[in-house]
Amino acid sequence: GQGLTDEGVHILDGFVGTGTFITRLLQLGLIEPKDLARKYAHELHANEILLLAYYIAAVNIETTYQDLRGELGDPGDYEPFPGLILTDTFQSWEDDDRPDLDVFVQNNERLEKLKALDIRVIVGNPPYSVGQDSANDDNANEPYPALDAAIRETYAARSNATLLRNLYDSYVR
């Protein structure tokens, strides 16, 4: 089998928030020191839709990486985290998703590369919105037709449960 540190094992936090899961992954030593630079530059991926959280995640992940490099005796120059993308993870894979080709060019390039990868590991804490369906709710469910169709045709079609609504909650999706 393969582990988190192995080459080619791409890790995604699709709802990175302020970067806690990625920073803890780096800090826990689950990635071997010899693999750290490769993993950081090419195999760690994090998506966030809220701009403030996106910037906080960038600072947290980049600072953690820099600190780890210093502990390993190779502080080197500061390196921005290339795996961070400003996006709605679910909407990004919808058929009607329209990338911003004018303003967020580099961000869109990162997203297209991510979508072509074989993601092996998903970490993180997705948004919680069960039972919410109004824009007035704290965290209303958004419709994702392609994702919902895939759930309907696979998990829901094979389920014996009578209440399938929770399958479409963002926490479960």
Segments from the language model and where they lie:
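SAM-dependent methyltransferase catalytic region
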Residues: 1-173
